[in-house]
Amino acid sequence: PWRVGLSATVGDFEMAKRWLNPTRPDRVRLINPPGATASIKFSHLHFIAAETPPELIDDLYTLTRDRKTLIFCNSRAEVETITAELNALCRRDKREERYLPHHGSINKEVREAAEARMQDKHRAASVVCTSTLELGIDIGRLDLVAQVNSTHSVMSFVQRLGRSGRRPGAPRIMQVYTVEPGPESNAPFYERIPFNFL
């Protein structure tokens, strides 16, 4: 019998070999095509604010308005709010609304329409989503991935980063935005640590 393992996130190949064939890991063949390792371009903007500031939305809009992008958020409410704010900027600029929401509470047909729009090579689109598009669903080739606030795990971060840079020679590009209220002046030390930033 043959066993095949595929992963975009495994870093310890020897451990993966032992997992695939515990008795004979030396018989596991690793196929890693030349050029498969993409360079990574990463940027992070941190805002001290009680809620998502307009500057974040403006920067996100400027970065994504002409690119195929997945914009990950950590809640459905955040997806809906950011989608509405980005589409308001499209209307302000007399552009077609190109930001589509995608999360588990949205009707299946609406989610599938967003996925189909992302696969359309002739129309610019960005999907603002929760973890629903973190893996598994083919949405075509992306120009970049954006993340609003920290992911809940390192694995989620790696999966989301891995959605971009799938063209030969293309870098993986991720823009991360974090927002955190400033600490009160008399707050204890541990409350002054910007955990969302970290």
Model region roles, listed by residue range:
Residues 1, 22-25, 35-38, 61-65, ...:
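Conserved catalytic network of the ASCE P-loop NTPase/AAA+ motor domain
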Residues 2, 121-124, 148-198:
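Conserved segment of the helicase C-terminal RecA-like domain
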Residues 2-80, 179-183, 195:
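Conserved interdomain linker/interface between the two RecA-like ATPase lobes of SF2 helicase motors
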Residues 8, 33-35, 104, 132, ...:
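Short, ordered loop/turn segments at secondary-structure junctions
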Residues 15-20, 81-86, 113-117, 138-144, ...:
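Alpha-helical scaffold elements adjacent to nucleotide-binding pockets in ATP/GTP-utilizing enzyme cores
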Residues 77-98:
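Conserved helicase motor "Helicase C" RecA-like lobe of SF1/SF2 P-loop NTPases
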Residues 99-131:
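Conserved helicase ATPase core of P-loop NTP-dependent helicases/translocases
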Residues 128, 133-150, 173-175:
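A short beta-strand element within the Helicase C-terminal
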